Every structure is written in structure tokens, then in C-alpha cells.
Amino acid sequence: MKKLFTFLLFLFFITKSFAQFDTEHWFAPMADASNGSEAQQYIYVSTNESTPFKVDIYNNNVIIGTINNLSKGSPQKFYIPREYIITSNNTEINAKATLGLHLVGEKKFFANLRFSVFNHAEILTSKGKSALGKNFYIGMGEQYLPNNAANRNGLNAIASVIATENNT
């Protein structure tokens, strides 16, 4: 019984460890309240496939770039122009937009979006096709706006969800 439980536990963790390993990945658009033009953003992709392959990067169903020769031991970066992923225009926030990225590879790969502004950086990891569905759960901690740590009304939080298919 103990061996069976250990095997099932191991099997559970192994299947979950590849949840971010897929042939397609999506990144939702983001908003920049500071309108920082010094921001840098890029896609970082890696794989455990030994045969090199390519990954196409789409914005609004148009290819904006291609990563070539992705293979095990040779991760790649692709710098993303700001207008494809980040907006500071208030009319585009909470509205249907043409921002966001869709990555499609010939084989399975891991993908994350890395970006930074003046004094802050983030890494967003895509779950791939395993994130498709109709039920989403969000959990986050409180984040105070700058110079408002004592003001409980100065909270800031963000959740970004992207619909990749109709009726999802």
C-alpha cells in the first residue's frame, strides 16, 4: 500500500511538472500606469527537444517574428516591441484590444514573458493549452501604490485573462 501511494504521488507530480510544456502559449496584454518608455520586454523560450525547431510569434493573428533553432541547451530570446503587449492608453484598458501574443511551435517548449520598467521587473510564465477552459481562479496579495503604504485606499491589484476561443 505504501509503495502504491508513493507511486501515485510521484505520477501526480510528474504529470503536473510538464503542465507548462506545450506547442502553443498565450500572453495577455498589460497596462503601464507610469507610461515608462524605458521598458524592455522579451519572450524567453526553452525546450528539452534535441532537434532544433522554430516558434512563430503572433499578434492579432499576424506573425511579428520567428524564433529559429530552438533546442535543448540553446534557449532563445525575442524582444517584443511595446505596442504589441503593453498599453498606457486608458481607453484600451478593460476593452477588446489587438494587444497580446500567441506563440506557436513545431514541438513542445516552455515560454515566459520578461519585462521591466524603471525600478521593477516581472516574469510571466504561460501554461500553454493546459490553461484553456471556462473556469479561472485568481489569488493575489495586496500591493500598495507608491508612497501609499499607510493609506489602505491606495491598493493596486491586477489580473489578466485572455480568451483564445469564442465562448470560453
What does each of the following model-derived ranges do?
Residues 1-23:
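Bacterial Sec-dependent N-terminal signal peptides
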Residues 20-168:
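Conserved functional hotspot residues at active sites or interaction interfaces
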